[in-house]
């Protein structure tokens, strides 16, 4: 095994760690707040569909000898999937499922999946079922079928962040969406690209890019949207204002009991005063 191969494996596990750890800040944030307000449900629906596809693609290409030989005949060795890719895909599916469970347990306000999001996800799942049936019917090779799974994952990676970016824009806030998730995801994307370039340098086979476009696209699209989320969090919506609440410190609270009674009488039932905090406090 060459030095570049060893470095590639090490980088693969590092980016696996970054991408895998990127799921936990959101889960922890939801648990700490006991609500999922500010987290897009369409993003979660797309995400679990994407990781289901990615898990199938990586596992079949890595473990199935027939599919692996079909890949060698078309692209030549090596296959663009390592054990870290399989572990990452399955781990991503499980953690996304846990986050979805949190949406049923914790307060979600009036948030729900959009009809457009449900419609897109339904069409995707129907197409996957049809392609799998065609694979068992020998209409297409299994390499073609699992490549379709990878293209679906690539498509989902392109669209899945749009609902969350729009929700942040609509709320003029990134509250409820963990920035640590974004920073770890960005690091993983950069390292994934670096690993692919090292594999090309080691083997001299540029088909590593064309043979696994989903891995390349996953890195590029993730990096692009991570940059957008970083801009939203640190530049556009640095000081979000929670709607419908006042943030008062102790010096702003009147001490005169009569004034307190007058204030209570003058306030509408919908006005809520909260000392020293904002509802939906930003995850910094």
From Swiss-Prot:
Membrane topology listed for this record: Multi-pass membrane protein
One cellular-component annotation, GO: vacuolar membrane
Location of the protein in the cell: Lysosome membrane
Region entry Disordered, spans: 247-269
Domain PQ-loop: 4-70, 154-208
Catalytic activity from the UniProt record: L-cystine(out) + H(+)(out) = L-cystine(in) + H(+)(in)
Keywords for this protein: Lysosome, Membrane, Repeat, Symport, Transmembrane, Transmembrane helix, Transport
Transmembrane segments: 3-23, 37-57, 86-106, 116-136, 139-159, 181-201, 216-236
Protein name per Swiss-Prot or TrEMBL: Cystinosin homolog
Organism name: Dictyostelium discoideum
Organism ancestry: Eukaryota, Amoebozoa, Evosea, Eumycetozoa, Dictyostelia
Gene: ctns
């Amino acid at each position: 095994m060459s030095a570049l191969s060893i470095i590639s494996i090490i980088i693969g596990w590092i980016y696996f760690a970054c991408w895998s750890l990127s799921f936990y800040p959101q889960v922890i944030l939801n648990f700490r707040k006991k609500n999922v307000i500010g987290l897009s449900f369409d993003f979660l629906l797309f995400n679990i569909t994407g990781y289901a596809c990615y898990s199938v693609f990586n596992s079949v290409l890595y473990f199935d000898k027939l599919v692996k030989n079909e890949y060698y005949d078309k692209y030549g060795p090596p296959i663009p999937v390592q054990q870290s890719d399989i572990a990452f895909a399955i781990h991503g599916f499980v953690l996304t499922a846990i986050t979805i469970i949190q949406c049923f347990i914790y307060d979600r306000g009036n948030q729900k999946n959009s009809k457009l999001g449900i419609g897109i996800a339904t069409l995707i799942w129907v197409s996957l079922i049809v392609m799998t049936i065609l694979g068992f019917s020998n209409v297409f090779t299994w390499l073609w079928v699992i490549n379709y799974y990878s293209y679906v994952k690539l498509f989902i990676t392109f669209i899945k962040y749009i609902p969350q970016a729009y929700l942040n824009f609509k709320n003029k806030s990134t509250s409820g969406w963990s920035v640590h998730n974004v920073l770890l995801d960005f690091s993983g994307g950069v390292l994934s690209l670096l690993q692919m370039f090292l594999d090309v340098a080691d083997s001299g086979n540029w088909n590593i890019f064309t043979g696994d476009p989903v891995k390349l696209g996953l890195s590029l699209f993730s990096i692009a949207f991570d940059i957008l989320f970083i801009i939203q969090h640190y530049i556009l919506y640095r000081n979000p204002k929670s709607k419908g609440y006042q943030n008062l410190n102790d010096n702003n609270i009147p001490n005169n009991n009569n004034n307190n009674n007058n204030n209570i009488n003058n306030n509408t039932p919908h006005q809520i005063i909260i000392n020293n905090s904002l509802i939906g406090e930003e995850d910094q």
